[in-house]
Amino acid sequence: MAAGVIRSVCDFRLPLPSHESFLPIDLEAPEISEEEEEEEEEEEEEEEEEEVDQDQQGEGSQGCGPDSQSSGVVPQDPSSPETPMQLLRFSELISGDIQRYFGRKDTGQDPDAQDIYADSQPASCSARDLYYADLVCLAQDGPPEDEEAAEFRMHLPGGPEGQVHRLGHRGDRVPPLGPLAELFDYGLRQFSRPRISACRRLRLERKYSHITPMTQRKLPPSFWKEPVPNPLGLLHVGTPDFSDLLASWSAEGGSELQSGGTQGLEGTQLAEV
């Protein structure tokens, strides 16, 4: 009985359960043909191209203001070959402006131009030469002059001897020194640009032969010593010792007076003869 009850499953011929997918039916990808896929890809590419064109047009309208639209200049990529040429042209333009405003100018190009290098002294001149040249100019109540202005010095033949007239850049005549002209001509003859004539030099040397130049005077050592600072300052009542200096000056003064007296006697004797 039990054997008859128990039968194999095959005898009942039951339908086998089918294995269904875990995904719902709606989410399953539908089958698409190759033609439809190509059409969809073409549509997507066209949409992307349209979006890129719209973005470029929007950037151009925002970046280009009224100045750029009026000039018609289109912004270029820094990596383009025209960018270095523009930089070179800009640098040449700037250097030209600098040379035009700050460089040396010619009066023919600009009548109001002033050469700042015109008043410069040559490097070959020593400090002593420049000092004495300025001293002469200040004594003549005129500004320091350069080599070109020094060439305009001239001795008037009709005027008295020793009166030197000077012409500046504009032809202005500076008043003469008068009696001091001979002293400056004799004392600064080696530093003055226009050399005096030989006869005039001999006459000046003969006239001032009794005067001992400062470089040839025998001054005492105390003359060349710098003063020592006194701790008491102005309260010190002691006077410095100038005895050796006064002695040397008195000796030189006596010799000069004696030479002047002998010259005066000789002059009177010649006048009497």
From Swiss-Prot:
User: Disruption effect?
Assistant: Mice were born at the expected Mendelian frequency and do not show gross phenotypes at birth. within the first days of life, mice however display reduced size, low body weight and substantially decreased survival. Examination of fecal pellets and internal organs reveal abnormal digestive-tract function, as well as changes in the composition of the intestinal microbiome. Defects are caused by impaired expression of gastrointestinal peptide hormones and development of enteroendocrine cells (EECs).
Alphabetical keyword list: Developmental protein
Biological process terms in GO annotation: digestive tract morphogenesis; enteroendocrine cell differentiation
Tissue distribution of the protein: Specifically expressed in the stomach, pancreas and intestine. In gastrointestinal tissue, expression is primarily restricted to gastric G cells and duodenal enteroendocrine cells (EECs).
What are the start and end residues of every segment in region (Disordered)? 18-84, 253-273
According to the UniProt entry, which residue ranges have a biased composition of type Acidic residues? 28-56
Keyword set includes RNA-binding: no
Question: Got any disulfides in this one, which pairs?
Answer: none
| Origin: domain of life | Eukaryota
Residue ranges under compositional bias (Polar residues)? 67-83
The function of this protein is: Plays a critical role in intestinal function by promoting the development of enteroendocrine cells (EECs) of the gastrointestinal tract and pancreas. It is thereby required for normal enteroendocrine peptide hormone secretion.
Q: What is the protein name stated in its UniProt record? A: Protein PERCC1
What's the source species for this entry? Answer: Mus musculus (Mouse)
Which gene name belongs to this protein? Percc1
